[in-house]
């Protein structure tokens, strides 16, 4: 049978639950030039892979003319039978729809929305490392940020080359929950 564990009050303190969604969305929006993208009428297809990313993207881009359509955005504990990883092998449907339905961009997020991949208008896969490289170039060249680049040990050597090209320091970190 099942054993139950008695719940006792914590004599050392209490738990405070806080919804940080509004603060998070505001923080992310502060890094986006919304004036530039507000009038753009891009058509974007986002595959959230049955994860948590849909509400954040909608809130971040609220007030723009970007038309967002979501796929795989229902609750599905088995993630629709696919691993919720934004790798090319898992994005066949996104690639097909972006190409056939003439989306300007496809975006894929993993289950907890901390990894990203993209699909170009013709259906070509854009690797996450390329996205990070483009972002680093944009921040340095267009935004004139001069800080270093941080990458995980699992990342490609692309960021090493970009850091060298931009003449900025490269920091490498280990991966895993203990770091």
Where are these regions (language model features)?
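Gly/Ser/Thr-enriched, mixed-charge loops and adjacent short helices
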Residues: 1-101
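Short acidic/polar active-site loop segments enriched in Thr and Asp
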Residues: 104
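Proline/glycine-rich low-complexity loops and linkers
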Residues: 1-26, 120-179
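Short, surface-exposed polybasic-aromatic patches that bind anionic ligands, especially phosphate groups
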Residues: 107
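Short acidic, glycine/serine/threonine-rich loops at helix termini
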Residues: 55-59, 80-83, 116-122, 159-165
């Amino acid at each position: 049978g099942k054993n139950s564990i008695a719940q006792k009050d914590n004599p050392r303190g209490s738990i405070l639950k806080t919804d940080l969604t509004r603060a998070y969305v505001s923080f992310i929006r502060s890094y986006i030039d919304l004036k530039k993208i507000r009038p753009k009428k891009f058509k974007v297809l986002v595959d959230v892979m049955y994860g948590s990313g849909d509400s954040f993207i909608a809130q971040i881009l609220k007030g723009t003319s970007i038309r967002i359509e979501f796929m795989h955005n229902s609750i599905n504990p088995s993630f629709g039978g696919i691993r919720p990883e934004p790798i090319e092998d898992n994005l066949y449907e996104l690639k097909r729809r972006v190409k056939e339905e003439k989306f300007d961009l496809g975006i894929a997020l993993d289950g907890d929305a901390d990894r990203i991949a993209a699909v170009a208008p013709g259906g070509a896969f854009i690797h996450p490392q390329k996205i990070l490289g483009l972002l680093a170039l944009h921040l340095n060249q267009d935004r004139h940020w001069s800080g270093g680049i941080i990458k995980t040990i699992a990342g490609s050597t692309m960021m090493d080359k970009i850091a060298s090209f931009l003449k900025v320091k490269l920091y490498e970190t280990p991966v895993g929950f203990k770091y």
